[in-house]
């Protein structure tokens, strides 16, 4: 690495380390290097080789290519190490947001780490797209497409993430086929995925019985700040709720207005509220929070 880029890389690694609460010694142990190495780097007394850079990226569970791109943005003055470290921290779904893990496992065969991995995979894809758009002077994806199309795209990314992170339990079905995720081995099941914005109810074109996993998201800023209301929507997708449940055809409310090409089957409110809440980020709650019991779908 050239010197300016190397120094930016070191500063970024340091900021991420501090944001995660890691000591120099702990990071060194995770990277498999001598305990004095991190101190020498941060003091500017040593610059990282390609091998060492790769070890540090691996220790932080981040792609080296991504860290190098971010170091380049620091050199250009586009952002700071502290901002990037905060984004990395907030874009990593937290285990404390998992609820009813036993129901997630019993209904879908998925473990919490698989769900968290799928969400993080989606975030990484979205952020990569936004970085490329920004590099060409464009606007973020959330401002480039209609919200209905954004929901569809995010749903596809989440579906791909589940398949990727499921340790072989699931593969994606072909486009526009039911169910979205096909089981490959026990305890996986036919799994339909639905996506909705904010407080909207997940819906499809036809009522279909089966096992459902639903995701709802909000639009905040890149640091995770979120304010309720359409006028306050940001440009960064944040998953705030995931639910799972067994749904029958009678659990849908259907609309079929003559001449209306947009036939819809929406999961009934009481049924949806009773579905097991398996991921919940209160910081991004689009409802008015109750004094007791979170929100109407909390369980």
Locations of regions flagged by a protein language model:
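Short alpha-helical DNA-recognition segment
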Residues: 21-40
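Nucleic-acid endonuclease domains
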Residues: 82-179, 195-299
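Alpha-helical residues within the helix-turn-helix
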Residues: 18, 29, 58
């Amino acid at each position: 690495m050239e010197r300016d880029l190397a120094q930016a890389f070191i500063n970024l690694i340091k900021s991420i380390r501090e944001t995660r609460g890691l000591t120099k010694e702990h990071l060194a142990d995770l990277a498999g290097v001598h305990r004095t190495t991190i101190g020498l780097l941060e003091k500017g007394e040593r610059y990282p080789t390609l091998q060492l850079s790769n070890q540090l990226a691996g220790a932080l569970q981040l792609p080296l290519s991504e860290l190098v791109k971010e170091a380049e943005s620091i050199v250009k003055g586009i952002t700071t190490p502290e901002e990037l470290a905060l984004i990395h921290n907030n874009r990593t779904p937290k285990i404390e947001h998992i609820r009813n893990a036993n129901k997630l496992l019993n209904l879908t065969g998925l473990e919490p780490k698989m769900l968290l991995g799928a969400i993080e995979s989606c975030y990484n894809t979205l952020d990569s797209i936004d970085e490329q758009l920004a590099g060409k002077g464009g606007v973020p994806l959330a401002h480039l497409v209609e919200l209905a199309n954004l929901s569809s795209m995010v749903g596809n990314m989440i579906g791909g993430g589940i398949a990727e992170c499921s340790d072989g339990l699931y593969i994606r079905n072909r486009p526009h086929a039911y169910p979205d995720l096909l089981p490959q081995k026990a305890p996986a099941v036919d799994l339909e995925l639905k996506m909705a914005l904010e407080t909207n109810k997940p819906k499809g074109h036809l009522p279909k019985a089966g096992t459902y996993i639903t995701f709802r998201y909000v639009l905040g800023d890149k640091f995770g700040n979120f304010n309720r209301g359409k006028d306050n929507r940001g440009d960064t997708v944040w998953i705030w709720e995931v639910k799972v449940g067994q749904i029958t055809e009678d659990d849908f409310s259907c609309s079929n207005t003559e001449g209306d090409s947009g036939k819809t089957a929406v999961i009934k409110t009481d049924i949806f509220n009773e579905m097991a809440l398996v991921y919940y980020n209160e910081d991004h709650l689009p409802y008015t929070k109750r004094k007791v019991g979170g929100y109407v779908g909390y369980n």
